[in-house]
Amino acid sequence: MKCREIIEILETLAPKSCACDWDNPGLLAGRMDKDVEKILLTLDADDAAVERAKEIGADMLLSHHPLIFKPVKHVSDEDFIGRRLVSLIQADVSYYAMHTNFDSAPGCMADIVADRLNFVDQKPLELMGELSGTAYGIGKTGTLKKPMTGPELAREVKNRFGLPFVTVYGSELYENEPVTRAATCPGAGGSEIREALRAGAQVFI
């Protein structure tokens, strides 16, 4: 399959128009007409991921966080961004990133997290727009299908996502009281805390 065809599939799933204005998703290096048989998925296009892609003979590297956010004035091996780009291009590995568009698009990260936690009455935490009549945005807010205490919810999150542990701040607030409304954000989430409070969330995940 051509790189172009894979990108068409990815952008049908998570259109670049769903990304935040400051973001930079898309094909960041490589050839559109590249024949792709093997893809390496990674959170970050760091040195280890780039070397691993070359080691396994990957034709395409797909990351969540873009390697390039700001305009690049030069590409050389004198800085970490240039070094990785040069390495990928020399190895003929096409590099694509899908970040906040994948976080926010309908059916993607925000929906997956909320569905796995059985949220009802789901709404985008930060509304960004509509796609085919469906509202989308960063994060989700909703009512828990079954009220539970803070510790119970922490265990639910841990189990639902197969995590070795979770970190809880303010655990004493709902230690013995039921949580009925929660909000999630598939990222750092610092800028969404106020939105979570406005939405009436008792817990922010």
Give a label for each model feature.
Residues 1-205:
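Hydrophobic structural segments
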